Amino acid sequence: MSKAYQQAGVDINAGYEAVERMTSHVQRTMRKEVLGGLGGFGATFDLSQLNMKAPLLVSGTDGVGTKLKLAIDNDKHDTIGIDAVAMCVNDILTTGAEPLYFLDYIATNKVVPEVIEQIVKGVSDGCEETNTALIGGETAEMGEMYHEGEYDLAGFAVGAVEKDDYIDGSSVEPGQAIIGLESSGIHSNGYSLVRKLIQQSGIKLSEPFNQEQTFLDAFLKPTRLYVKPVLAVKSSIKIYAMTHITGGGFYENIPRALPEGITAKIDVTQFPTPAIFDWLQEQGNISTDEMYNIFNMGIGFTLVVDNNQVESTLEILNGQNIKAYKIGETVKGNEPIQLTGV
């Protein structure tokens, strides 16, 4: 390799090793529509093989926020990639789109092949679960931009939906049911506050949070992927609107999927709140109302369906091994959201 480049702080050989290590993980995500392999200047996906009449492409990009800091500080890198995938594919899923392919971007102080492999393993796990091809990516070594051991991770997802099946919430009417799908925990938002509360509490992350997991396990639990269960519902039931509950909780996300003059009336007694949120609320002395303005509180994704389809929807979701509840209904109104039972 170039001695000049090495003296400038870039280890090309480490980059080559990282690519070799990640290749087997990437290959298990491939779909038949992907043309060519790794190493090209651009990745190619053959849309014609989808046999869609009038496909719309839906794209999304996101990162994992300061949840990364917890992963880095505790040298646990194998699940944070799932979060990157979930944040992107869950977003584009709200339009009814099936995720097709994904690209990742990793920027780091120094390429450590073993760490890069673990990150990409997580990305590949998320892609494999959602039938999304990890079609390309970039790993950038930038020693002067990041402190030792640090990295950032972002993702980019593209999906497709038939034009006639595109979901934008515009046809939502009063009196329809809102179905909430359980979250796996905190997901990937609010971690600046979470990390502050961890530090403030004085706990050791290796301590047990409950009988099943440590505090670290609870805080780093990957964001749930909703692609398979939601597409299973969409295949047989008309969905009028969908929401991925991320930063801003219920207050900021649920109204985004509803037309003017329609609001969501949510009864928070209709679903359980995971214990991790109770712990955060107690540590921060945070009001319940504010908690719903920050976190997902146990519901990571919502669907709006007709009332006569509630039972069928819940049955399909149960068959997909995900707990779901009728958490509310759409009503006339101009306020962003109505929460009862808080």
UniProtKB/Swiss-Prot annotation:
Gene Ontology CC annotation, any one: cytosol
Catalytic activity: 2-formamido-N(1)-(5-O-phospho-beta-D-ribosyl)acetamidine + ATP = 5-amino-1-(5-phospho-beta-D-ribosyl)imidazole + ADP + phosphate + H(+)
First-level EC class: ligase
Keyword Glycoprotein attributed: no
Domain of life: Bacteria
Keyword terms of this UniProt record: ATP-binding, Cytoplasm, Ligase, Nucleotide-binding, Purine biosynthesis
Disulphide-bridged cysteine pairs: none
Subcellular location per the Swiss-Prot or TrEMBL entry: Cytoplasm
GO MF terms held by the record: ATP binding; phosphoribosylamine-glycine ligase activity; phosphoribosylformylglycinamidine cyclo-ligase activity
GO biological process, one term: 'de novo' IMP biosynthetic process
EC number(s) from the headed UniProt entry: 6.3.3.1
Pathway: Purine metabolism; IMP biosynthesis via de novo pathway; 5-amino-1-(5-phospho-D-ribosyl)imidazole from N(2)-formyl-N(1)-(5-phospho-D-ribosyl)glycinamide: step 2/2
Protein family: Belongs to the AIR synthase family.
Entry protein name: Phosphoribosylformylglycinamidine cyclo-ligase
Gene assigned in the entry: purM
